[in-house]
């Protein structure tokens, strides 16, 4: 900073020089002292210079409305919104989110460093601050088949990027606590760069948790009960309280929303569908829900602002105070947390739920050919769906409502006319398949899914964490083939086939994960698909696509299905579907 600039800022902060903008007669939410102050907020050149009594070149009388720091999502995968950067910004910025920390491991699993470069490029000029954690597990484990492999040497150059804050969720806790040298090299590189390491270790406890934290892992977003969260807090980790579309843990973790725990806990969404962003909101939704549950509003705000900024080392961010960046939101109602205006570096960027100057997606498709042409597989044939195992019993991967966890159920092998072998819609058991789509290997994993609810037809998705192969669930092989091939033809996306007809589809041509359209356009097609699926049995407690997308992730207990077959996550081995 130049000497003259610093002098001018000091004079303005003293009140000797008028500020560029003053938000007058505000109720300022103070996240340092957990109180609300009656004051003006003085802003110059994107920086807050004073909280007190000020005059300005421009003055806006807030008439007692609340001024709050801009909201920060400390852990999200933008790709899970199915939106590219500009469309994602349009969905979250009007809700008061001024910064996100994203882990682009979805697109990196498909396209490697080309995917990471795409995300950096398409978010660099947004009003929304988009920070990155480098994907640590591509693929998630050795028991997976991704489109790319990212080792330490591929990640190392990215630590020089100013928007890269560290190493993202270390999902392979099994390998970490067993001192796998490939994982340890990534940890060493991140630590040498002075950056953060996020965790992902559901149920890790005792000595293994000690080992995980010793390795350098500083946070966790997978806690589903307060006992687990408390143990991790005691061992020095930050807790990311997750409230997303598929995984919703806030209610279970409400005891953390008070001192002394709240100073080490932040709010995150992890994965959020476009409709939930547009209609319910983003971090503002979690704060509203917390307040409605009896949480002190200022505590909830602190967990969605100051705490993530302190954790990630985002200096001079996350508070309404002198010297802090003027990323602010104006609330007309604190209890309802109604966002009226959003300021980014002192400039009004959104008002009454709309961005004032939305950005457009501008990208060189030739440069990112690997991102826009990510399907490398042959057409699906009925023969690929034939079970090669025989036996009298079958193993079912059972979904848990509002959770990413699954359970195991063993039932007698089902045989019913009109459905595929192993399917029993009366018991909510459907057939499940995962087709490798990156290397034309022809690998197909087959299994059975419980509690999904589908009564007829088939659902296909190229969003299938984390390797994003093609996952298909259905009651009969013919519709499974049709739904899967529809997604393949579209170079990615979602599809529902019924009685030999495609009932609905949503193309996602960006790595098979994201659309180039607006949030509203994506949501309209997605809602049409979901309505059709609910009409054919999908439970109200299940998000038809996001829940299905996690069935293939072999790092969250108990059972998953990928291109190798059914994975017992705890044992890290393949187990038979029929035996």
Name what the model sees in each region.
Residues 1-39, 43-44, 52, 93-95, ...:
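Active-site microenvironment of metallo-dependent hydrolases
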Residues 2-12, 89-194, 260, 503-507:
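Divalent-metal coordination cores built from histidine and acidic residues
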Residues 26, 46, 64, 75, ...:
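Divalent metal-coordination and catalytic microenvironments
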Residues 73-84, 139-151, 218:
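Active-site mouth loops of central-metabolism enzymes
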Residues 77-79, 105-107, 135-140, 170-173, ...:
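Active-site beta-loop-alpha junctions enriched in small/polar residues
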Residues 111-115, 141-147, 178-182, 208-212, ...:
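Short acidic, glycine/serine/threonine-rich loops at helix termini
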Residues 149-169, 175-240, 247-268, 278-292, ...:
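Histidine/acidic residue-rich metal-binding segments in metalloenzymes
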């Amino acid at each position: 900073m130049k000497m003259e600039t610093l002098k001018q800022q000091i004079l303005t902060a003293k009140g000797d020089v008028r500020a560029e903008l003053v938000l007058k007669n505000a109720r300022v939410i103070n996240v340092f002292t957990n109180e609300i102050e009656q004051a003006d907020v003085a802003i110059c050149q994107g920086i807050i210079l004073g909280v007190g009594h000020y005059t300005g070149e421009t003055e806006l009388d807030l008439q007692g409305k609340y001024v709050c720091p801009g909201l920060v999502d400390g852990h999200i995968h933008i790709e899970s919104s199915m939106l590219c950067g500009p469309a994602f910004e349009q969905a979250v910025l009007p809700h008061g989110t001024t910064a996100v920390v994203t882990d682009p491991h979805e697109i990196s699993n498909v396209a490697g460093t080309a995917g990471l470069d795409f995300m950096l490029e398409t978010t660099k000029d947004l009003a929304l601050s988009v920070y990155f954690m480098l994907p640590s597990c591509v693929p998630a484990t050795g028991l997976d088949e991704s489109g790319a492999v990212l080792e330490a040497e591929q990640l190392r150059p990215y630590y020089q990027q100013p928007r890269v804050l560290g190493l993202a969720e270390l999902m392979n806790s099994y390998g970490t606590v067993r001192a796998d040298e490939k994982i340890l090299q990534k940890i060493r590189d991140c630590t040498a760069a002075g950056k953060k390491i996020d965790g992902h270790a559901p149920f890790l406890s005792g000595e293994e948790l000690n080992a995980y934290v010793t390795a350098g892992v500083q946070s966790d977003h997978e806690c589903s009960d307060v006992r687990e969260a408390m143990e991790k807090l005691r061992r020095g980790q930050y807790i990311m309280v997750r409230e997303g579309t598929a995984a919703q843990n806030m209610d279970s973790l409400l005891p953390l929303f008070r001192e002394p725990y709240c100073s080490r806990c932040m709010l995150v969404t992890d994965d959020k569908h476009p409709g939930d962003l547009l209609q319910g909101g983003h971090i503002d939704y979690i704060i509203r829900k917390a307040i409605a549950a009896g949480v002190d509003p200022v505590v909830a705000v602190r967990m969605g602002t100051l705490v993530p900024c302190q954790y990630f080392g985002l200096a001079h961010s996350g508070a309404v105070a002198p010297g802090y960046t003027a990323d602010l939101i104006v609330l007309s109602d604190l209890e309802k947390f109604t966002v009226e205006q959003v300021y980014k570096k002192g400039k009004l960027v959104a008002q009454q739920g709309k961005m004032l100057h939305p950005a457009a997606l501008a990208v060189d498709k030739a440069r990112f050919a690997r991102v826009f042409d990510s399907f490398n597989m042959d057409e699906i044939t009925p023969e690929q769906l034939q079970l090669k195992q025989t036996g009298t019993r079958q193993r079912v991967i059972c979904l848990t409502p509002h959770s990413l966890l699954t359970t195991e159920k063993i039932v007698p092998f089902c045989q019913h006319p009109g459905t595929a072998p192993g399917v029993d819609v009366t018991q909510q058991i459907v057939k499940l398949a995962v087709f490798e789509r990156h290397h034309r290997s022809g690998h197909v994993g087959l299994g059975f899914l419980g509690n999904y609810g589908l009564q007829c037809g088939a659902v296909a998705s190229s969003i299938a964490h984390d390797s994003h192969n093609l996952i298909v669930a259905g009651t009969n092989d013919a519709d499974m083939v049709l739904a899967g091939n529809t997604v393949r033809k579209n170079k990615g996306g979602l599809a529902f086939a019924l009685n030999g007809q495609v009932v609905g589809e949503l193309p996602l041509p960006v790595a098979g994960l994201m659309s180039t359209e607006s949030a509203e356009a994506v949501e309209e097609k997605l809602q049409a698909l979901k309505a059709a699926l609910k009409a054919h049995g999908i439970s109200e407690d299940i998000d038809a696509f996001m829940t299905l997308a996690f069935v293939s992730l072999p790092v969250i207990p108990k059972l998953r299905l990928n291109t190798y077959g059914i994975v017992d996550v705890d044992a890290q081995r393949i187990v038979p579907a029929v035996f």
